[in-house]
């Protein structure tokens, strides 16, 4: 899935390396579909819905192409939008990224199959990252702070840069984390380089998937934020 959340960036990279194929949705029963549904908010006042329907489970590279009477829609409040195709997935965007905004995702089928009209998820609380200087020495490290959430939801971090070895991990939603001296590691041969870098955090929340998807799946929403800086020796 494409970037808003940085997990999506990794998925795009992995998808590019793997062979994929598509099958018409009208050739597959809902009971044989695995659903991967996400909502991402990156702090720009919008939320992007991404849906990837696959045949063969979570590790499959066979994606459904919506055909015939089948359709994918997303609803927020009184606004319903159809998802449009983007590569192997389907996407749409809504204005707004407030905490607890509910998204209802529907896979509506033709008369010969079972619809899955009620997968739902709400956005976690938004936040902002602070505490990172404009230039950070790799021999010093930094402390990143943010507004801790009220629900103890899982968070992940990613540190990356033009001259850095990319790193990622999971942390508690405590409002602060330390990237110690020496943890930002330069790519071999670029130990003395200064480069553009970013530290990103993502707060995640799971939703409820419509049980009609016989192969199961996941539905989640994330608030993702990044802080840019210069990484120096």
Can you say where each PLM-predicted feature lies in the sequence?
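Exposed aromatic-hydrophobic patches
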Residues: 89-96, 175-189
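C-terminal motif of bacterial Sec signal peptides marking the signal peptidase cleavage site
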Residues: 15-18
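Bacterial N-terminal signal peptides that target proteins for export
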Residues: 1-9
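Surface-exposed loop/turn and intrinsically disordered segments
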Residues: 84-142
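Short, aromatic- and glycine-rich surface loops/edge beta-strands on solvent-exposed regions
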Residues: 97-113, 190-209
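Short helix-loop boundary/capping segments
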Residues: 128-181
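Short beta-strand elements
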Residues: 118-127, 209-233
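Solvent-exposed N-terminal domain segments of exported/luminal and surface proteins
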Residues: 20-100
